[in-house]
Each structure stands twice: as structure tokens, then as C-alpha cells.
Amino acid sequence: METATLIAISISGLLVSFTGYALYIAFGQPSQQLRDPFEEHGD
């Protein structure tokens, strides 16, 4: 394969991995530990 193709596939794979990890942190099991500043403020 050409170098440009390998670089494009690598960058695409990293982007998909990062997006999946971000979604897991936002909505998965670790999201229970995140604090909600709007709930803490309470008017």
C-alpha cells in the first residue's frame, strides 16, 4: 500500500477509537462519577 493510504487509515482508526472512548466516558459506567455543576448550584 502507499504511504498516504496507511496514514489515512491510521488517522481514521485513531479518530474512531477516540470517539468511542469519549462516548464510553460520557454515557458508560464511569459517567456515574462525573459531577453535575447544575445540580450542585440548586436555585
UniProtKB/Swiss-Prot annotation:
Principal location: plastid
Compartment(s): Plastid, Chloroplast thylakoid membrane
Regions crossing the membrane: 7-27
GO CC annotation terms, alphabetical: chloroplast thylakoid membrane
Keywords: Chloroplast, Membrane, Plastid, Thylakoid, Transmembrane, Transmembrane helix
Highest rank taxon of the organism: Eukaryota
GO biological process: photosynthesis
Membrane topology: Single-pass membrane protein
One protein family per Pfam: PsbN
HAMAP family: PSII_PsbN
Role, per record: May play a role in photosystem I and II biogenesis.
Annotated family: Belongs to the PsbN family.
Name the record gives this protein: Protein PsbN
Organism: Glycine max
Taxon lineage: Eukaryota, Viridiplantae, Streptophyta, Embryophyta, Tracheophyta
Gene giving rise to this polypeptide: psbN
